[in-house]
Amino acid sequence: GATFDISNDSSTQKVVVNFVDEDNSIVGEEAFMNPANSKEFTIGYYLSKDLGIYDLDVGFRHDQIERSGSVTEEEHDDDHGDEHGDEHGEVDYYNIDDSTNSFAVTLGRSLTDNLGISLGYASVERLPSSIELFMNGPHMATGRFEVGDPNLNSETSNNFDITFNFDNGDFYAYASFYITDVDNYIALIDEEDDHMDEDEHHEDEDDHHEEEGEHHEDEHDDHGHGNLIHANYMQEDAEFDGYEIEFGRSFDLGSGELALSFGRDVVNAEFADGHYVPRINPARNIYSLVYTQD
């Protein structure tokens, strides 16, 4: 990659060009995905300008992405499963060639000598990763039989945030609040969670579902999934909101300085139908104590 600085006296401007050619290959017993290749060409532009009482930051990025890979379909033969366990199913080859565009703008200003505020908006497109597209096999590290989808669309997220910064030398505080709407959010959904959602709408058929569940478990064993949870990469609109806060103070102590701080971050995420997005980090409290000797 290369970065070109085209700044002038009134603004900071940079152009970034980057090219990545990446091979993804998983070998051994845990070969849950066939070899895949990704080629990505990126060009980005960044501008930072002082508008008097406001500071403006703008960024734009264009990605041209090509992903190629294959998916081996499972072959099931109940009568001769042990006899032909090493045989491979039909292989389907895919080539995804697409582009994405992302844009971000932040406008900030000082309210007082110690307090600043900034408002930001970002629209980001993301093409599915090779794993999300071509995964198809047992992933022992997660205890799941994970299945990708070569027909996934790109994600598009729109984010609004507001940030406050305070610093008077000895004491500082930071708080940021955001809300993000994501179209076609890609998530790894456990099949049993999908069944649970259906059960909520068919409570009168609980016994029937239990019998089917046992039957499906037997089928999974026959298909070589063992006790692994079957999970699929799927898409659904989602909404994220949350905040990050941090504050701290420094003290002169002996021949050095003692810095104390506390931080907390919270993320809430729901799909459009009201169900929670899986695998979201729980709220965190972060405590820090650092002593620096002069």
Report residues per predicted region.
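Outer-membrane beta-barrel domain signature
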Residues: 1, 30-34, 92-94, 149-153, ...
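Outer-membrane beta-barrel translocator domains and adjoining extracellular loop/strand segments
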Residues: 1, 17, 25-32, 68-77, ...
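Face-selective signature of the C-terminal outer-membrane beta-barrel domain
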Residues: 1-122, 174-177, 242-250, 257-259
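Residues that define the transmembrane beta-barrel architecture of outer-membrane proteins
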Residues: 37-41, 97-101, 156-160, 169, ...
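Short beta-alpha junctions and helix-cap segments that line functional grooves
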Residues: 103-105, 161, 274
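Membrane-embedded beta-barrel scaffold of Gram-negative outer-membrane proteins
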Residues: 110, 116-122, 126-132, 153-230, ...
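Gram-negative outer-membrane beta-barrel transporters
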Residues: 178-182, 198, 215-294
